[in-house]
């Protein structure tokens, strides 16, 4: 067993020295002038307020008397003992969306199983609140699809998949000729489930880990193999895989061009059987989305996916490894992936760890001006996924496409939109 974690308080100088020795940071010569300008001007501004991180409430659930309707899910056939609560909840949500005013959807204590995606569409002023409740997905698909919702809140849940699409094992043997690695799997991982495809990875990854004394945890080994079959760039490093249920072992074979390097026996490895297939929370064309006091332990792709969302607020909503589990990966892609969003995006007091791809990927795009005259201009987006809605009162900035210098700033006074194109009237002559 690895050594137990010990909490040690470090002086600022010790932290800086530790960061310089971290395997993910490049080193600078002792006399490097570049080193002088590294980091923040005030190192004391860095840190975590543990009390705020664990307890601060920024978006509280109103008192029950403030709601026009309160829905206890048990009264609508939604119970922890059900094998699949998705059908009953989807029916209830169709009723809820026709009710005006503040609505409270309560999940009392328990583990609620869902075998399909739950769809929240065209709903305003809804609080989805777990009271020591877990939302557990038993199918490999998105947990929630939220579209065209406004003032939408998710509070107080744990979210997980059973089974999750990642497994953890320890290297027990390798075969140079076959370019293969055999892992002894942890007891919690049952790969007899058909979704594991007998051990062969269609889309997913193989990642080796190393024990880090500083963090008291396994972290990705920068000198080890990270190989994958990608849904995005069509890379295929993992050409074979087989699960032996009797021995509880998994053997992965690598392609000839994968850069195979046999790991040492005892190396910890995480293997995932999804990559980008399913976002866990799919927010699209929503306004004022709030998530607070939630823990997410696994996802089958990107975890929080936001397209064309105005104002996103997340507090104490963690993407973290589940305590007691041997899993080493949380999200098989990005933690938070935002595309074409606008307004506020505020994430506070939250932990994002062990994702396969970016912790946060905030994508931003631009419109291209095609013509202008007087105080009007025509501009357009390159695609629907990069199409920001432009509205009266918005401030737009015009940049030189070659130098990226700011040319001028205007306020929009009139908008005519047609598909991806916008005819804008602004507050002064262009």
Can you annotate each of these PLM segments?
Residues 6-62:
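Surface beta-loop-beta hairpin patches that serve as ligand-binding interfaces in beta-rich domains
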Residues 20-36, 41, 73-106:
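Acidic Gly/Asp/Thr-rich repetitive segments characteristic of extracellular carbohydrate-active
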Residues 86-93, 100-126, 131-145, 159, ...:
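N-terminal extracellular ligand-recognition/capping segment immediately after the signal peptide
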Residues 101-102, 114-118, 137-143, 163-168, ...:
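Short glycine/acidic-rich loop motifs that flank beta-strands on beta-rich extracellular proteins
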Residues 107, 126-131, 151-156, 265-268, ...:
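All-beta strand scaffolds that present successive hydrophobic residues in beta-strands
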Residues 114-116, 123, 136-138, 152, ...:
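Surface-exposed loop/turn segments connecting beta-strands in extracellular beta-rich domains
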Residues 161, 186-245, 385-421:
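Ser/Thr/Gly-rich low-complexity blocks that favor extended beta-strand/coil architectures
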Residues 214-285, 290-292, 297, 428-429:
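Long, low-complexity, polar/charged, intrinsically disordered or flexibly structured peripheral segments
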């Amino acid at each position: 067993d690895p050594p137990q974690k010990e909490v040690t308080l470090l002086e600022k100088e010790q932290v800086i020295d530790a960061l310089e020795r971290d395997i993910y940071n490049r080193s600078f010569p002792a006399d490097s002038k570049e080193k002088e300008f590294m980091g923040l001007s005030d190192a004391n501004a860095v840190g975590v307020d543990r009390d705020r991180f664990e307890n601060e409430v920024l978006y509280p659930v109103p008192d029950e008397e403030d709601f026009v309707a309160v829905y206890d899910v048990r009264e609508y056939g939604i119970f922890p003992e059900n094998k699949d609560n998705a059908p009953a909840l989807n029916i209830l949500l169709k009723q809820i969306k026709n009710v005006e005013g503040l609505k409270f959807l309560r999940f009392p204590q328990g583990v609620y199983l869902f075998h399909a995606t739950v769809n929240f569409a065209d709903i305003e002023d809804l609080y989805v609140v777990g009271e020591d409740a877990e939302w557990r997905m038993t199918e490999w698909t998105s947990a929630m699809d939220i579209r065209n919702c406004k003032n939408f809140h998710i509070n107080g849940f744990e979210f997980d998949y059973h089974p999750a699409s990642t497994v953890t094992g320890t290297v027990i043997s390798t075969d140079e000729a076959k370019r293969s690695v055999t892992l002894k799997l942890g007891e919690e991982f049952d790969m007899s489930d058909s979704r594991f495809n007998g051990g062969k990875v269609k889309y997913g990854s193989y990642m080796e880990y190393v024990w880090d004394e500083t963090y008291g945890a396994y972290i990705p080994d920068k000198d080890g193999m990270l190989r994958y079959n990608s849904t995005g760039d069509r890379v295929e490093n993992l050409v074979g895989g087989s699960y032996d249920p009797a021995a509880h072992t998994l053997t992965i074979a690598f392609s000839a061009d994968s850069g195979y390097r046999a790991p040492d026996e005892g190396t910890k490895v995480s293997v995932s059987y999804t990559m980008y297939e399913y976002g866990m929370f799919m927010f699209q064309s929503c306004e004022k989305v709030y998530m607070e006091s939630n823990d997410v332990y696994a996802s089958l792709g990107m975890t929080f996916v936001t397209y064309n969302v105005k104002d996103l607020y997340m507090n104490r909503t963690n993407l973290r490894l589940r305590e007691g589990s041997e899993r080493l990966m949380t999200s098989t892609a990005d933690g938070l992936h935002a595309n074409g969003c606008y307004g506020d995006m505020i994430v506070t007091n939250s932990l994002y760890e062990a994702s396969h791809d970016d912790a946060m990927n905030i994508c931003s795009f631009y419109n291209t001006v095609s013509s202008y005259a007087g105080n009007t201009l025509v501009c357009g987006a390159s695609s629907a996924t990069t199409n920001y809605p432009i509205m009266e009162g918005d401030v737009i900035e015009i940049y030189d496409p070659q130098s990226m210098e700011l040319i001028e700033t205007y306020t929009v006074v009139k908008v005519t939109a047609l598909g991806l194109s916008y005819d804008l009237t602004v507050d002064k002559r262009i």
